[in-house]
Every structure is written in C-alpha cells, then in structure tokens.
Amino acid sequence: MKFFALTTLLAATASALPTSHPVQELEARQLGGGTTRNDLTNGNSASCADVIFIYARGSTETGNLGTLGPSIASKLESAFGRDGVWIQGVGGAYRATLGDNSLPRGTSSAAIREMLGLFQQANTKCPDATLIAGGYSQGAALGAASVEDLDSAIRDKIAGTVLFGYTKNLQNHGRIPNFPADRTKVFCNTGDLVCTGSLIIAAPHLTYGPDARGPAPEFLIEKVRAVRGSA
C-alpha cells in the first residue's frame, strides 16, 4: 500500500463524494473539530472512577478525542455518571499524522508506547477500575496494537474495545490479536476501503457518527456492567 494513495484520495474525495454527504460536513469530520480530555493523567488516585475509557482519534483530527470520541464519552457519562468514568484521549507522542498510516502496524512505535503508557498508568493509579478503549481509523490500528502488546494482567482488565474504520481490519481478521473477540466490536461501513486492506479514503470512512452515538457506547456499557454489575 502506497502513502500517495491516501494523500491523493483525501484531496480527491471532495470531487467524488455523493451529493448526500456535503463536502463541508465530510471535511469537518476528517480534518476538523475535536475535544481534549485528560481525566486519567490529571486525576487523583484517591478519587478514581470505576471506569476508565482510553481513546485514540483518527489521522489529522484535533484535540485528543477527535470527532467520534466526544459522542462516546457523553453516552458513557450518562450511563455511569460524570464521576463514574474517566475519559482519556491519546495525545503526546501520538501525532495522528497521515504518513504513519503506512507503517507496518498502521501507526508509529512512539504512538503505541504512548497508549501503552496510558493503560499502565490506569492500572497503577486506579487498580480496581474497569478499562475500556476505542479508536478511529489510524487510532483503531493504534488501539489494537496497544491492546495486543499489553501485559496480560492489564489486558485482562479491558472489558471492551470499539474500533471504527479499522485500518488493520483485513490483516488482523476483524479482531485484535491476543484479545478476546467477544470483547471487541469493529465498525466497518460498507464501502469503507480501509477495512479491506487499502489506505484509500472514501466517503463511508467518514460517516461513523451514528455508531459513536449509539451502538459503540452501548456495547461498552454492556461489557462494563457484565463485569461490575448494573449499578
């Protein structure tokens, strides 16, 4: 897979999109707005949340939650309470640059170390917390690589993971290596070419908003409650 395919298609997407997806909306989803949350890194171990959600945004997205993360966070907070869940985006060494998509694991080694560090910090700071995770596009590859590389003792604390537009979906057979399939939910739209082994960005790759507002957080909530009970 060549990096030029990704950059060329990003430039060409506007002229090729169906009229049902306005160019401005799609550009905003791929390149625009985002929110930053650092509840884990800023939080006090004396007041740990019961649940910690660690999320990796897609390429070029701003903040550390990007475009989809805030919707998931909102639904999680509705379910568990504002103090019952900590929301943590992956920032720091994870730059979410386009070129890193072409690396063997779909992101950089530095980014993987960054997300691993957040899982490790969650385990050290809040050892009784239930962990959940997610990622979009390059962030999905990052989430998968990080979970795969975790020490098994920490990995076993992850109740569920959601991946959108998973760039390593084909290579990893629709799952996360070394992680239970029943704790993984992959969202790959029909026509999203990155889910079939390409780095070509087509319109379906940019339309995961409804999944982030509904099925994805609902899956995570279900998995957390299976571990912690319905309270």
Swiss-Prot record:
One of its GO terms (biological process) is carbohydrate catabolic process. The keyword Secreted applies. The record marks 59, 138 as: Transition state stabilizer. It is an enzyme of class 3 (hydrolase). It comes from Fusarium vanettenii. Its EC number is 3.1.1.74. Disulfide bonds join 48-126, 188-195. The 2 disulfide bonds play a critical role in holding the catalytic residues in juxta-position; reduction of the disulfide bridges results in the complete inactivation of the enzyme. One of its GO terms (molecular function) is cutinase activity. The active site is at 137 (nucleophile), 192, 205 (proton donor/acceptor). PANTHER family: CUTINASE 1-RELATED, CUTINASE 2-RELATED. The gene is CUT2. The lineage of its organism: Eukaryota, Fungi, Dikarya, Ascomycota, Pezizomycotina. This is Cutinase 2. Belongs to the cutinase family. Catalyzes the hydrolysis of complex carboxylic polyesters found in the cell wall of plants. Degrades cutin, a macromolecule that forms the structure of the plant cuticle. Allows pathogenic fungi to penetrate through the cuticular barrier into the host plant during the initial stage of fungal infection. Keywords: Disulfide bond, Hydrolase, Secreted, Serine esterase, Signal, Virulence. One of its GO terms (cellular component) is extracellular region. It catalyses: cutin + H2O = cutin monomers. Residues 1-16 form the signal peptide. The keyword Secreted applies. It holds the Pfam family Cutinase.
